[in-house]
Curated annotation (Swiss-Prot):
Citrate synthase is found in nearly all cells capable of oxidative metabolism. The lineage of its organism: Eukaryota, Viridiplantae, Streptophyta, Embryophyta, Tracheophyta. PANTHER family: CITRATE SYNTHASE (PTHR11739), CITRATE SYNTHASE 1, PEROXISOMAL-RELATED (PTHR11739:SF27). It holds the Pfam family Citrate_synt. Its EC number is 2.3.3.16. The active site is at 321, 360, 416. This is Citrate synthase 1, peroxisomal.
Length: 480
C-alpha cells in the first residue's frame, strides 16, 4: 500500500508511542519481565526417521516415515490391517489431544517450560516493548514492520474502522440484554453480506488468490472489530453506537468508544489504554486452540473470512474457552471474602466446586501471560483503586499454590485469573478477549490460503451405532 501524507504526519506520534525509555513516557511503570528469549535456535533438532511397527494381531511389520518435526501422517497407518474386511487403523483422539491438522509458523508453545512466542518473539518481550497493531502485523506477515510499514498499517486499519450502517442497525435491533459477544458473532458474520465482491461463494474460489483482496479484508476485520464490539457493549447499556476517531491508537479508540458516550473531546487515560494494549497483545494468538481451530475449519471449506472469524468468536464465547474469564470473576464473587477460601478449597478438592483461572491443557508450568497480567493488575488498581475481589484472588492464589493437591496437579494461575479483574476494574466485558484474538484468526486464515497442504477439514468418526436395519411400518412396529 502507498504511504499517504496523513500517515507520514503520524510518524512522530508513533515514534513517541514505541519508545519506552523516555522520561515522560506514559506506559505503565512495570518492570521488564523475565522472557523466554534464551533459546534462539529452532525449538528442536530434526526428528526425521522411520517408525517400526509390529502388529501383534498378524505378525506383520510396517515402516512409517517420521517427519523432521516428529509427526507421522495418519494415512500411513491405514495400511496396517488384519485383512480384506479391515479398512485399516484409524486414530481415536477426542478433543484432538495429540493431533496436528496443520503446520504453522505463527506461534510456538512449550507447555512444560511455560513458553509462548509469536513468530519467534517471546510474548513477554512483545508485551513490554511493542504495541498491539505492531504485533498484528507481525502475526499476519511474519516479521516486525519498518517504521514506514507500521505507519501505513495503522493508517489502513484506522481508515477501515467505520462499520456499515446496516450492521449498526442490526445491533440496535437486538434485545437490551444481549450478550456483547453474541452480538459480535452476529455482526461479524453479517459483514460478508456487505462485501459480496470478496465472498468466494459468490465470486469463486480464486478471489483470495489476490493478495490485495486478502489484505483489504484483513484491515476491514481488524478495523471494524472494536467498533462492533463497542456498539454491542453500548447496546446492552441502552446507548447508541459511537464512531471511532482517526487520531487515536487502536486501544485508545476502543476505550473512547466504550467510555465517551459520544463526547468527541473525551480523552481515554493513556496508562489504561496501554494496559489494554498489552492485554490485547497477550491474547492475540495461541496456536491451535479451540476457536482458532474452528476458524481454520470453516475457512477450509473455501468460505469467506467474515464467516470464519465469526465462527472463531463464537467458539471463544464458550465458558470453557474465553468465557473462563467471566467464570473466574463469578467464582471470586461467590467466595466473597478471604475467610471463605479454606471452605472453597476443600469443596474444589471434593469435586463439589470448580476452580476457574487455574490450570491449562497446554501449560504444565506457569502460563507466561499470567505473570504479565498480574503486574498489569497492580498498575490498573493503582489508577482506579483496588477491587475487594483482588484480596480474595491473592489469597486464593497463595492457598492453591501452597496446597499439595493443586501443586501435584500443576494447577497454576493462567491468563484468565487476573485479566478478568482488570477488565472488571476498567468496565470492559471480560468476554471481549475475542476482539484481540481476531488477529490470530486472520493470521491462520492467511497462512492456510498459502499452505499447499490445506484441504477441507473432514475428520473421521468411530461408529458405535446399530448394524443394518430395515424399515417397518408403524403398524408393524406396534405389534412388537
Amino acid at each position: 500500500m502507498e504511504i499517504s501524507e496523513r500517515a507520514r504526519a503520524r510518524l512522530a506520534v508513533l515514534n513517541a508511542h514505541l519508545t519506552v525509555s523516555e522520561p515522560n513516557q506514559v506506559l505503565p511503570a512495570i518492570e521488564p519481565w523475565c522472557t523466554s528469549a534464551h533459546i534462539t535456535a529452532a525449538p528442536h533438532g530434526s526428528l526425521k526417521g522411520n517408525l517400526k511397527i509390529v502388529d501383534e494381531r498378524t505378525g506383520n511389520e510396517y515402516q512409517v516415515p517420521v517427519s523432521e518435526h516428529g509427526t507421522v501422517k495418519t494415512v500411513d497407518l491405514k495400511k496396517i490391517t488384519t485383512g480384506k474386511d479391515d479398512k485399516g487403523l484409524n486414530l481415536y483422539d477426542p478433543g484432538y489431544l495429540n493431533t496436528a491438522p496443520v503446520r504453522s509458523s505463527i506461534s510456538y508453545i512449550d507447555g512444560d517450560e511455560g513458553i509462548l512466542r509469536y513468530r519467534g518473539y517471546p510474548v513477554e518481550e512483545l508485551a513490554e516493548k511493542s504495541t498491539y497493531t505492531e504485533v498484528t502485523y507481525l502475526l499476519i506477515y511474519g516479521n516486525l514492520p519498518s517504521q514506514r510499514q507500521l505507519a501505513d498499517w495503522e493508517f489502513a486499519i484506522s481508515q477501515n474502522s467505520a462499520v456499515p450502517q446496516g450492521v449498526l442497525d442490526m445491533i440496535q435491533s437486538m434485545p437490551n440484554d444481549v450478550h456483547p459477544v453474541g452480538a459480535l458473532v452476529t455482526a461479524m458474520s453479517a459483514l460478508s453480506i456487505f462485501y459480496p465482491d470478496a465472498n468466494p461463494s459468490l465470486m469463486g474460489l480464486g478471489v483470495y488468490k489476490s493478495k490485495q483482496v486478502r489484505d483489504k479484508q484483513i484491515v476491514r476485520v481488524l478495523g471494524q472489530a472494536p467498533t462492533i464490539a463497542a456498539a454491542a457493549y453500548l447496546r446492552k447499556a441502552g446507548k447508541p453506537p459511537v464512531q471511532p476517531l482517526s487520531n487515536l491508537s487502536y486501544s485508545e479508540n476502543f476505550l473512547y468508544m466504550v467510555e465517551s458516550m459520544g463526547d468527541r473531546s473525551y480523552k481515554p487515560n493513556p496508562r489504561l489504554a496501554r494496559v489494554l494494549d498489552i492485554l490485547f497483545i497477550l491474547q492475540a494468538e495461541h496456536e491451535m486452540n479451540c476457536s482458532t481451530a474452528a476458524a481454520r475449519h470453516l475457512s477450509s471449506s473455501g468460505g469467506d473470512v467474515y464467516t470464519a472469524v465469526s465462527g472463531g468468536v463464537g467458539a471463544i464465547y464458550g465458558p470453557l474457552h474465553g468465557g473462563a474469564v467471566e467464570a473466574t470473576i463469578n467464582m471470586l464473587s461467590e467466595i466473597g471474602t478471604v475467610e471463605n477460601i479454606p471452605e472453597f478449597i476443600e469443596s474444589v478438592k471434593n469435586k463439589k466446586r470448580r476452580l476457574s483461572g487455574f490450570g491449562h491443557r497446554i501449560y504444565k508450568n506457569y502460563d507466561p501471560r499470567g505473570k504479565v497480567v498480574k503486574k498489569l493488575a497492580d498498575e490498573v488498581f493503582s489508577i482506579l483503586g483496588r477491587d475487594p475481589l483482588v484480596e480474595v484472588g491473592d489469597a486464593l492464589e497463595k492457598a492453591a499454590l501452597s496446597d499439595e493437591y493443586f501443586v501435584k496437579r500443576k494447577l497454576y494461575p493462567n491468563v484468565d485469573f487476573y485479566s478478568g479483574l482488570i477488565n472488571r476494574a476498567m468496565g470492559i466485558p471480560s468476554s471481549f478477549t475475542a476482539v484481540s484474538r481476531i488477529a490470530g484468526y486472520l493470521s491462520h486464515w492467511r497462512e492456510s490460503l498459502d499452505d499447499p497442504d490445506t484441504k477441507i477439514m473432514r475428520p473421521q468418526q468411530v461408529y458405535t451405532g446399530a448394524g443394518i436395519r430395515h424399515y417397518e411400518t408403524v403398524r408393524e412396529r406396534t405389534k412388537l
